[in-house]
Amino acid sequence: MAADEDELNLLVIIVDTNPIWWGKQALKESQFTLSKCMDAVMVLANSHLFMNRSNQLAVIASHIQESRLLYPGKNGGLGDFFGDPGNALPDCNPSGSKDGKYELLTVANEVIAEEIKDLMTKSDIKGQHTETLLAGSLAKALCYIHRVNKAVKDNQEMKSRILVIKAAEDSALQYMNFMNVIFAAQKQNILIDACVLDSDSGLLQQACDITGGLYLKVPQMPSLLQYLLWVFLPDQDQRSQLILPPPIHVDYRAACFCHRSLIEIGYVCSVCLSIFCNFSPICTTCETAFKISLPPVLKAKKKKQKVSL
């Protein structure tokens, strides 16, 4: 029991808040909106914090223009990257003790609700770049985990995992950054779980398979909370005792840099390792010119002229 209390379990939840996808979803199906998705995320966050007093939580919104740390907020200890990580509660909490609710849960709900409201209110869609910055959100999650890990005491063990709640489609433009983040998480023994709401994500399938996490495409979006509590609330030690969804077939095809399409056979630049579906004498990524080796030219043998006597 003492060993479990000394162990720090950090859960970082990344929520896809793409306003274009959620706007289309609200027009198509009013039963499942962003607010209901955030309610399910808050229940999962509260359950994680309530399971052990040493559990830690962070929530990141993956938007089209930024990746914002929703919780801990700006007033929280862990929200400030240069603050005291041991203080996760704000100095004042007027509503935390009125209804007898655990103060940490109340603070988490209030901070997440205020931050997500501020983020969606200030959203200004410009240009054609409307993809979710998922690679940047994963990088921010790894930086946050590293920052908390440095503040952990020497006699305390820390386990970290990342849960991605994905809504919009993958962005092939983020392929290289995404793969770099995946291998960085694997090196740090950080699990990446994925809960996909809409179409399957090949990038997240690879992330879960490489890091040892779970990948689940939700069959019914209004039942999101049930899947979050059933599949993603248990940590990596508890999962071995549960019957979880079976592993899926992972699509390991790479995306070419010229058309951003998945290919099985392609051409790889020997300098920057960019992948192309068609041969090009000059790499469009690093502008390296390749020397094309031509087959050797065989000199024709001179015919011996017969000398007539």
From Swiss-Prot:
Membrane-spanning parts: none
Chaperone keyword on record: no
Role played: Component of the general transcription and DNA repair factor IIH (TFIIH) core complex, which is involved in general and transcription-coupled nucleotide excision repair (NER) of damaged DNA and, when complexed to CAK, in RNA transcription by RNA polymerase II. In NER, TFIIH acts by opening DNA around the lesion to allow the excision of the damaged oligonucleotide and its replacement by a new DNA fragment. In transcription, TFIIH has an essential role in transcription initiation.
GO biological process entries: nucleotide-excision repair; regulation of DNA-templated transcription; transcription by RNA polymerase II
One Pfam family it belongs to: Tfb4
Protein's recorded name: General transcription factor IIH subunit 3
Record-level Gene Ontology MF annotations: RNA polymerase II general transcription initiation factor activity; zinc ion binding
Organism of provenance: Mus musculus
